[in-house]
């Protein structure tokens, strides 16, 4: 985590002191190098605690245990893929108006310029590259690493803000459809500020109840209390609002479709995967470490949230006509599926959620990476489903890869999604949540319809006369898509090594 923070600060210094022409290479090298070094550090720490559940660190505000390390490793792997997509700077084909037809640079050359203004067109013609996105991404990654490892609520809130603030900025930096991007950033910021306020108010209530912000101290206070727990339950509910907002669970999901659609697609890919991983890690730690004694009170609430999330996500996705919005509602539905593992409240439930987050993170990055390649003649992303007709016929490789990710989301056998859903449903069934499993299976069947609909559209429908083009990416995006597709297939065919790793990380430090 300190490696990532150091890289983020160094990235800010690069922006301040390095010539513009040298920044891109320096920022990319620094971001990738720091992320890979952080992965190596996680591996070293894991090897140093063979028979140990975990230990506190940083004066007890952070805990280093196996679930935290698993989640941090997953976030860092997803971050590497996200940085590859964010770094894509495919050379555009110049057009008469200074546009970038065929180019894959997702970020505006001058964020402060009014969309469509002369200043923006001049910056585009000059080939100005937005390199501030790299330190912003690294700050977001640092917050994500801290969020699931925080051992007190104040540290958790700080992590929440550190991961959120850079994402608010990144969402508003799209090169094309600037107004839509800025609208998405504003919505995300306003709703995110409200959710953070709810979280902080809940922290204050739990502090008033327990007299401590430490998660284990809160657990001890609840266990020793023989009176009313209404203050603790109210605080828990408010904290739950803040965390469920980040995972995109209903009814706190309204920001997801607009933000996923308006944000630059590489940012959407990174945010959709990494934020969900970090937020679910924090949710698990809160309920499994601080509030296990209140399980009879919070489980019914999560039951309702999980069912509502699965229903809203799947039913609304069926009606979508935009690929990015369809994937956004798919992400909402997957939050409901993951919540079934959280509700299990047992060690298989924890390990199944860890596996699901790993598999889902890779598939999500890959799916959005493919979306970023489909462009019209002016270089705009083509996300209307009708424009994807015949895409698989014209480019079988791209169609096949995107179909693989959709089949994984649907939970089809021999993909990572099947193993993920089977694991969480099995754990929920063992935890007594059979009705929830039934709802999950039905929701998965409904979800399969809109995934297969896109596959049929790509391979069995005639393309339009002015069909969109597939932009050939550089090695950065190609590497990201290749790795995510390989992992999606590998976890479907040979999931046991990762399942064993997740089973070894199925216990928090209490």
Protein language model regions, located:
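Alpha-helical transmembrane segments of multi-pass membrane proteins predominantly involved
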Residues: 1-510
């Amino acid at each position: 985590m300190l490696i990532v923070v150091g890289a983020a600060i160094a990235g800010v210094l690069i922006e301040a002191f390095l010539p513009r022409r040298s920044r891109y290479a320096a920022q990319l090298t620094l971001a990738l190098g720091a992320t890979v070094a952080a992965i190596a550090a996680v591996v070293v720490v894991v090897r140093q605690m063979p028979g140990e559940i975990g230990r506190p660190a940083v004066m007890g505000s952070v805990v280093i245990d196996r679930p935290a390390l698993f989640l941090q490793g997953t976030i860092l792997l997803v971050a590497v893929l996200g940085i590859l997509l964010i770094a894509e700077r495919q050379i555009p084909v110049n057009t008469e108006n200074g546009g970038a037809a065929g180019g894959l640079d997702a970020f505006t050359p001058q964020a402060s310029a009014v969309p469509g203004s002369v200043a923006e067109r001049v910056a585009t013609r000059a080939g100005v590259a937005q390199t501030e996105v790299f330190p912003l991404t690294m700050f977001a990654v640092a917050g994500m690493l801290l969020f699931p490892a925080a051992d007190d609520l104040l540290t958790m809130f700080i992590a929440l803000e550190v991961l959120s603030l850079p994402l608010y900025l990144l969402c508003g930096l799209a090169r094309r459809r600037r107004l839509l991007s800025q609208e998405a950033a504003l919505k995300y910021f306003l709703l995110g500020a409200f959710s953070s306020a709810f979280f902080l108010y809940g922290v204050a209530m739990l502090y008033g109840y327990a007299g401590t912000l430490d998660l284990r101290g809160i657990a001890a206070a609840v266990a020793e209390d023989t009176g009313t727990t209404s203050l603790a339950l109210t605080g828990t509910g408010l904290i739950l609002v803040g965390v469920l907002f980040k995972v995109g669970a209903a009814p706190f999901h309204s920001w997801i479709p607009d933000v996923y659609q308006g944000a630059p697609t590489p940012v959407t890919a990174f945010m959709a995967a990494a934020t969900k991983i970090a937020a679910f890690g924090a949710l698990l730690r809160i309920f499994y470490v601080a509030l296990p004694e209140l399980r009879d009170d919070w489980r019914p609430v999560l039951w309702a949230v999980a069912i509502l999330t699965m229903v809203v996500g799947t039913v609304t996705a069926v009606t979508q006509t935009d690929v990015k919005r369809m994937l956004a509602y798919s992400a909402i539905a997957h939050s409901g599926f993951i919540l079934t593992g959280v509700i299990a409240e047992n060690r298989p439930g924890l390990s199944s959620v860890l596996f699901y987050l790993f598999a889902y993170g890779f598939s999500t990055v890959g799916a959005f990476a493919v979306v970023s390649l489909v462009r019209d003649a002016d270089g705009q992303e083509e996300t209307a489903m009708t424009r994807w007709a015949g895409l698989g016929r014209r480019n079988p490789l791209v169609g096949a890869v995107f179909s693989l990710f959709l089949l994984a989301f649907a939970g089809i056998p021999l993909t990572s999604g099947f193993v993920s859903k089977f694991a969480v449903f099995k754990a929920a069934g063992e935890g007594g949540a059979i009705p929830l499993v039934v709802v999950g299976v039905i929701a998965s069947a409904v979800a399969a319809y809109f995934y297969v609909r896109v596959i049929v559209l790509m391979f069995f429908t005639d393309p339009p006369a002015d069909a969109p083009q597939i932009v050939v990416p550089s090695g950065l995006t190609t590497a990201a898509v290749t790795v995510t597709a390989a992992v999606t297939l590998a976890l479907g065919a040979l999931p046991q090594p990762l399942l064993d790793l997740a089973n070894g990380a199925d216990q928090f430090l209490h």
